[in-house]
């Protein structure tokens, strides 16, 4: 496993994974937030590279991505930003990036820049398993975790997807589980059990986890919880101090 990411999961009983959009609401905010990351209860930070057609994102994150893109944030500016602050950040940073961006940049060039900017893992939500082998191998050679996404499907397919993975598995939990319906919770528990049956990698649950109540409820079933939309909403305040304080409330035990 990726050393830095695996260390986090080895050191902590439960891991908090957060998400921001690079350059939203501004480049200055993103830089300042990253410099204050150690003051938050986030253990691993996903950073979204703005993209014009973010298929896996909801309205709020898509809008944030659009605003950042319109402001001139590109893959290069994201790399430049991260390179400028990487020596002051102690927590693992993970890219959430759409494959078209990686392909357009050039896979080898993209990975080289990831190494230089301190990226420890990559999530590519629109990359089919059948096409993931090449990039997962190249990432592994550069000590960058390829973090696979798995959703409810056959155990055999989950096993194949997980076999390419490193760092942790991103389990898509948008099963209506943030409510109180017992049937949905049972589906979630069965799904997580299936994932754990076929892989020794830690499992983190994302999609639909928005409140502290959600975080507390889902923590008991997985190794990590991922919060995206709520954190992006907080960053829209353009106030780093407020964002840090509210994130800590969000992940409060």
What are these regions (language model features)?
Residues 1-20, 86:
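N-terminal amphipathic alpha-helix/helix-capping segment at the start of soluble metabolic enzymes
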Residues 16-20, 45-47, 93-97, 122-124, ...:
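Hydrophobic faces of well-ordered beta-strands that scaffold small-molecule active sites
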Residues 27-37, 153-163, 205, 209-225:
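Catalytic cores of alpha/beta
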Residues 44-54, 119-123, 127-131, 171-180, ...:
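Glycine-rich phosphate-binding active-site loops on the catalytic face of alpha/beta enzymes
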Residues 45, 49-51, 60-125, 245:
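Active-site beta->alpha loop and helix N-cap motifs at the rims of alpha/beta catalytic domains
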Residues 57-67, 229-253:
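C-terminal helical cap(s) of enzyme catalytic domains, especially alpha/beta-barrels
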Residues 61, 71, 158-194:
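Glycine/Thr-rich beta-alpha phosphate-binding loop at enzyme active sites
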Residues 70-72, 118-131, 145-153, 159, ...:
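Catalytic beta/alpha-barrel core
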